[in-house]
């Protein structure tokens, strides 16, 4: 099983109170991997797995996430760091333009050990209820 498929299985298992749907990216390049909804709150999540701190997003993914953010959508990048056994969650607002990624994650949790349940509860709360960043006054083209 591919690493991103394993991460998808972890999300489904550990955040069961959200109605999750895995999206087929070949149908529409750039659309995030996962769509979830709970009590009328919708969220898109791009899943990434790495051994470094780099977020590898295609230009299509960057553009989709950036435009979704500009239109008031709730979308995130979930980065699983294999060596450190950490999840880092970034709001799509870190894409200050379609080609530039900045910022530290707004949520960083360890997903193993005795605190794993609490970590996943924090991830769920962050994805569904964290305040969205304000849009820039003059978004870059």
Predicted regions located by residue number:
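Beta-rich catalytic cores
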Residues: 30
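Acidic-basic catalytic patches of nuclease active cores, encompassing PD-(D/E)XK
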Residues: 1-25, 134
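Nucleic-acid nuclease catalytic cores
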Residues: 69-95
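Charged phosphate-binding loop/patch that engages nucleotide di/tri-phosphates or the phosphate backbone
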Residues: 106-141
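Sequence/structural signature of beta-propeller domains
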Residues: 55-56, 92-99
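Conserved catalytic cores of phosphodiester-cleaving nucleases, focusing on short active-site segments
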Residues: 34-36, 41-51
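Active-site-adjacent loop/helix micro-motif of nuclease/hydrolase catalytic cores
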Residues: 51-62
């Amino acid at each position: 099983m591919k690493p991103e498929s394993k991460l998808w299985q972890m999300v489904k298992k550990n955040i069961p109170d959200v109605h999750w749907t895995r999206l087929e990216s070949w149908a529409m390049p750039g659309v995030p991997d996962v769509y979830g909804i709970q009590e009328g709150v919708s969220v898109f999540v791009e899943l990434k797995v790495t051994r470094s701190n780099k977020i590898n997003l295609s230009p299509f993914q960057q553009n989709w996430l950036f435009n979704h953010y500009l239109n008031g959508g709730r979308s995130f990048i979930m980065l699983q760091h294999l060596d450190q056994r950490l999840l880092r969650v970034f709001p799509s607002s870190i894409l200050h333009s379609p080609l530039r990624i900045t910022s530290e994650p707004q949520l960083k949790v360890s997903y193993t050990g005795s605190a794993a349940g609490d970590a996943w509860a924090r991830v769920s709360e962050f994805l569904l209820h964290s305040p969205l960043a304000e849009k820039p006054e003059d978004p870059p083209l």
